[in-house]
Amino acid sequence: MNYQKELLIEAIQEDNLKEVQKLLQAGVNPNTLDEYGKLCIRSAINNENLDIVKVLLDYGADPNAIDKIKDPIILEAIRSRELGIINSLLKKGANPNVLDRHENPIILSALPRGVNIVNTLLNNGADPNQVDKNGNTALSIILERTGDINVDVTALLIEKVKEKALNLRNSNGETCLHLAAQQGKIQMFDKYLDYYQTVNITDKAGNTPLYWSKLLGHTEISDMLNKRAEELNETAYTKITKTERFEDLPPRPKIALSYNLEIGGRYANEEKTKLIYQGGDVEYIDFRAIVPESANTEKKINEEVINEAKQKAKELLAGKDALVIPGNNREVDKEVAKHFGGEVNIKTGQPDFARSLAEMVMAEVAIEKGMPIMGICGGHQIINTYLKVPILKEK
């Protein structure tokens, strides 16, 4: 690399606009690569320096050049949410349909970065029906990301390919309306409910949007669906199977989930959401109500203690159809395991005697009642220990 090219790279890195202009006027190549094989304009984009990007483009920087990074430089601007830089690159001929190094359209990277960026790409020729290497369009990817649905971005994509988009389904057979009902996105119903000639659109499980709005307590959406059903002179159902139609929510299995509000637990919260989405009627069962925390001080375990705990567990699990024991950062107490004929020889965290005893007793009651049990992480240890499967550290 010659000295002037080094000076250009240094000036860009230091946001020295005047020096950049001076060097470009002197004939330094605006497509200069740095010592790592990266285009110098990439540094200007990383620095979010619109003025330097514009100068480089005006002096001939190629907006479609590919360097050692292999990703198009416009992708750098998209990831940085730099709308001004994106516009400048597109104005100079950047390809809005270019693929990244993983063979995915760049519009896919724009989806989580806001409606303005997606709109800019679409207005400059980005194809909303362009597919990635797995055959997914931007809208179908949004449908698969059921954790959230960006109303503005989704609506923008729908407007580009309206009829096809509104009938698009994800792998669960869900339409935009199903996802909007799940997440309480009233704006989607305001915009598009009237397009559908029935409210009884079913997914693969036979669930309609009304099922999800009722299940998750989105009453305003439920009201909108019922009103639309009246306009269409039809009955709104929550679930349609080959043999039955349900106007209200169908019977749901009652699931007990071991939990304590003060201790909390990420797995418990996540699992409750997942179970509700699978149609479960989930109720937290406080393991501290079975064996109080004070037991951690005494650590007393005998038949009297066990029987008292079992009686409380039976009361709390009465009427339940299944038990879920989620994980936490506490290991099964060795003395509790020993009492139930198990063996624990690991060291992953501090044991919780009271919780171990409470959940071991819950597992015993559930097994005696013939209830299915699911264990997650530490919950696996509880079940395995009760079943006398040794939990040993790796050799």
Swiss-Prot record:
Active-site residues annotated for this sequence: 377 (nucleophile)
PROSITE patterns noted in UniProt: ANK_REP_REGION, ANK_REPEAT, GATASE_TYPE_1
Family matches, as SUPFAM superfamilies: Ankyrin repeat (SSF48403), Class I glutamine amidotransferase-like (SSF52317)
Domain of life: Bacteria
Pfam families reported for this sequence: Ank_2, Peptidase_C26
InterPro entries: Ankyrin_rpt, Ankyrin_rpt-contain_sf, Class_I_gatase-like, Multifunctional_ANK_Repeat, Peptidase_C26
One of the record's GO molecular function terms: hydrolase activity
Chain positions of ANK repeats: 3-32, 36-65, 69-98, 101-130, 134-166, 172-201, 205-234
Segments forming domain Glutamine amidotransferase type-1: 272-395
Transmembrane segments: none
UniProt keywords, alphabetically: ANK repeat, Glutamine amidotransferase, Repeat
Record's protein name: Putative ankyrin repeat protein RF_0950
The species this protein was found in: Rickettsia felis (strain ATCC VR-1525 / URRWXCal2)
